[in-house]
Amino acid sequence: MISDEIFEQTGISSFLTDCATSQLVDSLNWRIQNGIDKILAKPIIPADLYRAVRDSQLVGMSGYSKEGLPIIAVGVGLSTYDKASIHYYIQSHIQMNEYRDRVILPSATKQYGRHISTCVKILDMTGLKLSALNQIKLLTAISTIDDLNYPEKTDTYYIVNVPYIFSACWKVVRPLLQERTRKKVQVLAGSGRDELLKIMDYSSLPHFCKREGSGSSRHSRNGTNDDCFSLDHAFHQQLYSYVKHQAELMEPTTPIKQGSFHVDFPEPNPADAKIAETLQSEFQRLGIQNGLSNSPDNVNISID
């Protein structure tokens, strides 16, 4: 018998009419076979390694919208994913998904007095360059994991600090997106600050939206770290403490083991694979068109 809790945590109850039974079964099997229910008791250690992951996989939570939806910030352009193995980045991503579903969303539901099951994502494109091609395999794996196992968790995607290279790629990628996804995406001018303040208070704005100009600023205010990507930010401190505490509860007399938590990578969704292929072609075309090196490792695109 499948419990209501599993349906709630996986977000499946809201889209059963659109989801094949086989996908539901596959998702539950994926959780069982990979021990996903225990992933929040598997901290990435030592702390220096986790800090390196946080410094190269820029994701965080900056606050809540006026309606109580968690604000998830993603530093798409400046994430390098080059400080650890792919397994640590996958592990960290799934841990944030699970922490959102098991802790953040239930807490928001209680705090705001209504059921909250989705979040708002703000994607910062500052620093986007051709070297992003190197990360397509990892990003496609993460996207596929989310599509198959954490569906319909994002209410709206806001894209900010957009350089020319993104604008050009967006024109060719947008038609490939499913209509329901396309409707969720809003590309804002500059840092998007004015538009975002319509749905959230200033204190909930990600740090990269608080500057008058574009760009990801990292600064402290009133003695607190304002950079929601940093391990020193309150959100990541709470998440990391939670995971370490769960590990101690599970095996109180055993030292926490080092090593990544390996998760099977699903086959890429054909639609995601098509988008990745299109992005790669467009990035390469832009590089040639602008007289840039074809090697993605040493090419920077200015945001002028």
Where are these regions (language model features)?
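Basic, amphipathic alpha-helical/coil surface patches used to engage anionic, phosphate-bearing ligands
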Residues: 1-304
